[in-house]
Amino acid sequence: MDPEHAKPESSEAPSGNLKQPETAAALSLILGALACFIITQANESFITITSLEICIVVFFILIYVLTLHHLLTYLHWPLLDLTNSIITAVFLSVVAILAMQEKKRRHLLYVGGSLCLTAVIVCCIDAFVVTTKMRTNLKRFLGVEVERKLSPAKDAYPETGPDAPQRPA
């Protein structure tokens, strides 16, 4: 294959790999919640749902670490990440609400529920990041100029000097 016809590698990291702190944070929070649920001998459904979510997150991490997402091109991986984040947030929010009702009787179960609730927040942040990346890539594909603001404080401090715009009096 000619080097000029070669497909350039994307320098952008995939949305679900370990370079994104949301994935590692969600995995550690769900592992902590699972440990709390196992120690308190919680309802089997709590343990099952959290262990299922751990398996799904580990599956996505393995896909990205082994770079299998480049081989399976018929799947739109960012959309699959978005769907996973939304479904994880829904399931873990149900577990968190049900587990946090046991505050007065079993405190460690309440801690597990609060860890699940924190994992829900992290999954929502991950879904927002994936959606933003998808929208940026779609705009770039369609040829729409993508405007990036580096800092919102940049507009707050106007330039000073002889070439700076003057305020109307």
From Swiss-Prot:
Tissue distribution: Highly expressed in testis.
Cellular localization per UniProt: Membrane
Keywords linked to the UniProt accession: Chemotaxis, Cytokine, Membrane, Transmembrane, Transmembrane helix
InterPro entries found in the cross-reference section: Marvel, MARVEL-CKLF_proteins
GO (cellular component) term, any one: extracellular space
Biological process terms in GO annotation: chemotaxis
MF terms in GO: cytokine activity
Residue ranges of every copy of the MARVEL domain listed in the record: 17-135
Membrane topology: Multi-pass membrane protein
Residue stretches spanning the membrane: 22-42, 46-66, 79-99, 110-130
Family: Belongs to the chemokine-like factor family.
Protein name: CKLF-like MARVEL transmembrane domain-containing protein 1
Organism: Homo sapiens (Human)
Record gene name: CMTM1
